[in-house]
Amino acid sequence: MDENESNQSLMTSSQYPKEAVRKRQNSARNSGASDSSRFSRKSFKLDYRLEEDVTKSKKGKDGRFVNPWPTWKNPSIPNVLRWLIMEKDHSSVPSSKEELDKELPVLKPYFITNPEEAGVREAGLRVTWLGHATVMVEMDELIFLTDPIFSSRASPSQYMGPKRFRRSPCTISELPPIDAVLISHNHYDHLDYNSVIALNERFGNELRWFVPLGLLDWMQKCGCENVIELDWWEENCVPGHDKVTFVFTPSQHWCKRTLMDDNKVLWGSWSVLGPWNRFFFAGDTGYCPAFEEIGKRFGPFDLAAIPIGAYEPRWFMKYQHVDPEEAVRIHTDVQTKKSMAIHWGTFALANEHYLEPPVKLNEALERYGLNAEDFFVLKHGESRYLNNDDENF
């Protein structure tokens, strides 16, 4: 966090009482009924960490989180330098707005022109892609966001760092009422300070934040009051919507925002389990055995949001970012009926051509005997409504 960000956060935090909920518990405690109240410190409804066959979060000797699978390799400084200096960048993002508008149009979301239609109240599910890993999900009488970033840059500063080449389809003020936000990890393209501040200013303590273990203090400094911090396999709910369960589930990634804070915060995916629908958000991840575990416990899902971009060069990126073929493997592992593509077409974060991910996705789907509707790609601002009553759902 830069100095301006720190000062802004201190000023903002003084507007709210420091009553964020630290849902931290020992796995040996009783597993009784959960209370999704903002001030609850009771145990969880069901702690899946008590099951011996789930992969639990793990810390190294230095107290920092580590990936527990052999599929992981740390991104060393020499390898980072090799990537930045030696590898050719094939992203080829055009500078022409006209060309970008033709190739990657940004649509006005339905909720701007027809705000009265926001909120799915029947058994259906609707998703709207707002760019990168930001998805607005409407299901089971709730509306929530994943990894919201509405800023121009994914960076500590809005004057440098990765810049959007496709604008956000809407502003935060144009969103319908949001009940919850899911954060997968603390990288700048998934946890955006300005977006957190703006969402908190608009919705206040009526907005519930679900965040990984270790992120609560940062959220408090931003002034967020209604925060639930979870370990892998822990769960909680939005007050008044206890039939919809938000479970923090594993992924293979890492965390860092400042020079010395590597992996002090956990990373993960989210499994949202409702009476009518089940939604999976993969966040940012390399391929690992966790997804079979998630599918075994919570599948089949009705819809999953799975990343397909930022994967080249593979020798460096494969540990932290899946490629389109691995995304299809996740689709299969978590046992989802449909998937939507995220984490592409917004920021140039790796070396593949900016239009390549959907092409590679379709090739992978063919190899797996799936069609484009099984794992679909939306335009920026586009929505997709899925109905449980539909035979093709």
Swiss-Prot record:
UniProt binding sites for Zn(2+) 2: 189-190, 284, 343
Pfam families per UniProt: Lactamase_B_2 (PF12706)
Cofactor(s) required for function per UniProt: Zn(2+)
Catalysed transformations (reactions): an N-acyl-1,2-diacyl-sn-glycero-3-phosphoethanolamine + H2O = an N-acylethanolamine + a 1,2-diacyl-sn-glycero-3-phosphate + H(+); N-butanoyl-1-hexadecanoyl-2-(9Z,12Z-octadecadienoyl)-sn-glycero-3-phosphoethanolamine + H2O = N-butanoyl ethanolamine + 1-hexadecanoyl-2-(9Z,12Z-octadecadienoyl)-sn-glycero-3-phosphate + H(+); N-hexanoyl-1-hexadecanoyl-2-(9Z,12Z-octadecadienoyl)-sn-glycero-3-phosphoethanolamine + H2O = N-hexanoyl ethanolamine + 1-hexadecanoyl-2-(9Z,12Z-octadecadienoyl)-sn-glycero-3-phosphate + H(+); N-octanoyl-1-hexadecanoyl-2-(9Z,12Z-octadecadienoyl)-sn-glycero-3-phosphoethanolamine + H2O = N-octanoyl ethanolamine + 1-hexadecanoyl-2-(9Z,12Z-octadecadienoyl)-sn-glycero-3-phosphate + H(+)
Gene3D superfamilies per UniProt: Ribonuclease Z/Hydroxyacylglutathione hydrolase-like
Major location category of this protein: Golgi
GO cellular component: cytoplasm; early endosome; early endosome membrane; extracellular exosome; Golgi apparatus; Golgi membrane; hippocampal mossy fiber to CA3 synapse; neuron projection
Activity regulation remarks: Activated by divalent cations. Activated by bile acids and their conjugates, except for lithocholic acid which is rather inhibitory. Binding of deoxycholic acid favors the selective release of anandamide and likely other unsatured long FAEs. Inhibited by phosphatidylethanolamines.
Effect of residue 257 to A: Impairs binding to bile acids resulting in loss of activity
Biased segments, Polar residues type: 1-16
Effect of residue 389 to N: Almost no change in activity
Record note on cofactor: Binds 2 zinc divalent cations per subunit.
Effect of substituting residue 152 to A: Almost no change in activity
Entry comment describing in which tissues the protein is expressed: Widely expressed. Highest expression in brain, kidney and testis (at protein level). Expressed in adipose tissue (at protein level).
Record-listed deoxycholate binding positions: 256, 260, 348
Top-level EC class as recorded in UniProt: hydrolase
Binding site for an N-acyl-1,2-diacyl-sn-glycero-3-phosphoethanolamine: 188, 321
Outcome (variant: residue 159 to S): Impairs homodimerization resulting in loss of activity
Region (Disordered) location: 1-40
Location in the cell: Golgi apparatus membrane; Early endosome membrane; Nucleus envelope; Nucleus, Nucleoplasm
Record: residues binding Zn(2+) 1: 185, 187, 253, 284
Keywords of this entry: Acetylation, Endosome, Golgi apparatus, Hydrolase, Lipid degradation, Lipid metabolism, Membrane, Metal-binding, Nucleus, Phospholipid degradation, Phospholipid metabolism, Zinc
Protein task: D-type phospholipase that hydrolyzes N-acyl-phosphatidylethanolamines (NAPEs) to produce bioactive N-acylethanolamines/fatty acid ethanolamides (NAEs/FAEs) and phosphatidic acid. Cleaves the terminal phosphodiester bond of diacyl- and alkenylacyl-NAPEs, primarily playing a role in the generation of long-chain saturated and monounsaturated NAEs in the brain. May control NAPE homeostasis in dopaminergic neuron membranes and regulate neuron survival, partly through RAC1 activation.
Family of the protein in this entry: Belongs to the NAPE-PLD family.
Record note on quaternary structure: Homodimer. Bile acids promote the assembly of inactive monomers into an active dimer and enable catalysis.
Protein name as annotated: N-acyl-phosphatidylethanolamine-hydrolyzing phospholipase D
